[in-house]
């Protein structure tokens, strides 16, 4: 028979009440705990939190690093890393599990740090960040040098002093901390800031960068082993020299940078040339160039002198030809003596021709003015107006006759036809006047003194300048000048004159046959 437990007065907890009571007890009793162990099951969540497990050879405890504390850890949580963490113990009521909320984390000894560094080096090397072919050459003569270091201390003074002694250039210093949890982030920001500068902007873009820090322990230099900083150096486009610690100190940034310097002073020497050495080198090149050029010029001058000795003198080559030319010139008459008579005759003929042409031009101009006056448009308009008035008078007379002779109504019906005939008469009169005007225009053209020349005729000028109008005026052998439309020619009269036809023998000019007048219609009535 089962024993019956008597009723108790103790209160009964709900599950939630018990879970939260245990949570308060743990958080109160273990509000600050320093825990050492090995990290495992490290998970970097997308929301920024880090979930992990801390274990030893016998036990394990879950842990979490909230997003706000991840950047302040100083190291990156990785699987297998032995660390010392600080935080508080709490529970997760939904699963009845306890865990530690981590606030700080540090490597448990130098050996752990070096082991983490070796793993990170192997990872980055496998990605090709240490490959020699991605190293950029340093500029030979930089105009701007960017220095990333602490603004105080001996490092920046040594760099500035060394650059000032060697090379005149502008130095831009980006101050940042070089030790502690914030060092890696500030150095990365400085590298990205220098690379973001645009060439030709208000702030000059450096040609080369120097990341420098003095010596220290492994923990002091640990910020330069940060994976994010190493990737920032690899992504930059400006050549970078790392000068962290002493010659025996090696950090992760040394493998990614384009050049490693054992000391900050050595970094300044790598970044800049020596101005005095460059001047000496340029002077030596200039001296060697001048010597080489002088020898080449002297050698060519010697060859040219030797070649010139074998050539004859120009005066000797031209002496015989010059002598023959002088003899030929003495035997020629003077050009002025040959051309003077012809020039005198030409001037006299030109004067006579000008006088004759002017006289003929004046005569023809007066004739042309008379013809033009008769053919002016005003005259033609007056004649046309007179014809119009006569036609109007005839019309009025026809109207008067029609009114006076009522009995001739039948004839009055033919008045439109008569009007048409009168208009035809006026048109014929106008055509005759137009033909007459065309004939006068032809006459005017024929009176143009240069018209015969355009038709192929020529003017014959005698020796005294006058124009020959008859063959009897010219004697055989007499020299004359023929004037054509384009140019003149000299000629000599040959043969005897055959005379001219008498007026009776000349063909009589034919007069154009007048056109017959149209026969008057038989049915045309009398106007009166």
Swiss-Prot record:
EC assignment: 3.1.11.6
A molecular function (GO) term: exodeoxyribonuclease VII activity
Keyword Oxidoreductase annotated: no
Residue spans of biased composition, Pro residues class: 504-517
Family: Belongs to the XseA family.
Its biological purpose: Bidirectionally degrades single-stranded DNA into large acid-insoluble oligonucleotides, which are then degraded further into small acid-soluble oligonucleotides.
The protein's assembly and partners: Heterooligomer composed of large and small subunits.
Name this polypeptide is given: Exodeoxyribonuclease 7 large subunit
């Amino acid at each position: 028979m089962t024993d019956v437990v008597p009723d108790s007065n103790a209160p009964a907890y709900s599950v939630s009440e018990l879970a939260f009571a245990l949570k308060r007890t743990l958080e109160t009793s273990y509000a600050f705990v320093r825990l050492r162990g090995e990290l495992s099951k490290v998970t970097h969540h997308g929301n920024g939190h880090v979930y992990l497990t801390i274990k030893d050879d016998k036990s394990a405890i879950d842990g979490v690093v909230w997003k706000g504390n991840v950047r302040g850890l100083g190291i990156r949580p990785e699987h297998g890393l032995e660390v010392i963490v600080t935080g508080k113990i709490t529970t997760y009521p939904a699963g009845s599990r306890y865990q530690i909320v981590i606030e700080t984390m540090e490597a448990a000894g130098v050996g752990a740090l070096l082991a983490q560094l070796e793993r990170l080096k192997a990872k980055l090397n496998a990605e090709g960040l240490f490959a020699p072919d991605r190293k950029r050459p340093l500029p030979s003569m930089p105009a701007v040098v960017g220095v990333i270091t602490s603004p105080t201390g001996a490092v920046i003074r040594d760099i500035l002093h060394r650059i000032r002694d060697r090379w005149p250039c502008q130095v831009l210093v980006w101050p940042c901390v070089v030790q502690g949890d914030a060092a890696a982030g500030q150095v990365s920001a400085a590298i990205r800031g220098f690379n973001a500068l645009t060439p030709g902007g208000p702030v000059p873009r450096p040609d080369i960068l120097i990341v420098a820090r003095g010596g220290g322990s492994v923990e002091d230099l640990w910020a330069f082993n940060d994976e994010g900083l190493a990737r920032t150096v690899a992504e930059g486009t400006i050549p970078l020299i790392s000068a962290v610690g002493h010659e025996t100190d090696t950090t992760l940034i040394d493998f990614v940078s384009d050049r490693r310097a054992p000391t900050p002073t050595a970094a300044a020497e790598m970044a800049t040339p020596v101005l005095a050495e460059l001047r000496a080198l340029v002077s030596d090149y200039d001296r060697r160039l001048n010597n080489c050029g002088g020898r080449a010029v002297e050698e060519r001058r010697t060859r040219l002198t030797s070649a010139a000795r074998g050539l004859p003198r120009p005066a000797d080559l031209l002496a015989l030809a010059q002598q023959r030319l002088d003899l030929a010139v003495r035997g020629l008459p003077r050009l002025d003596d040959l051309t003077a008579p012809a020039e005198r005759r030409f001037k006299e003929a030109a004067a006579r021709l000008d006088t004759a042409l002017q006289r003929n031009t004046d005569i023809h101009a007066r004739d042309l003015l008379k013809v033009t006056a008769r053919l002016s448009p005003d005259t033609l308009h007056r004649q046309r107006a007179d014809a119009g008035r006569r036609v109007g008078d005839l019309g009025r007379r026809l109207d008067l006759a029609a009114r006076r002779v009522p009995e001739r109504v039948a004839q009055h019906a033919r008045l439109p036809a008569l009007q048409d005939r009168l208009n035809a008469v006026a048109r014929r009169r106008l055509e005759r006047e137009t033909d007459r005007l065309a004939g006068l225009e032809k006459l005017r053209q024929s009176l143009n003194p240069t018209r015969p020349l355009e038709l192929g005729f020529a003017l014959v000028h005698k020796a005294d300048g006058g124009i020959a109008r008859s063959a009897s005026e010219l004697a055989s052998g007499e020299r004359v000048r023929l004037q054509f439309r384009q140019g003149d020619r000299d000629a000599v009269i040959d043969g005897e004159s055959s005379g001219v036809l008498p007026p009776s023998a000349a063909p009589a000019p034919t007069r154009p046959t007048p056109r017959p007048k149209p026969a008057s219609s038989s049915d045309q009535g009398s106007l009166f």
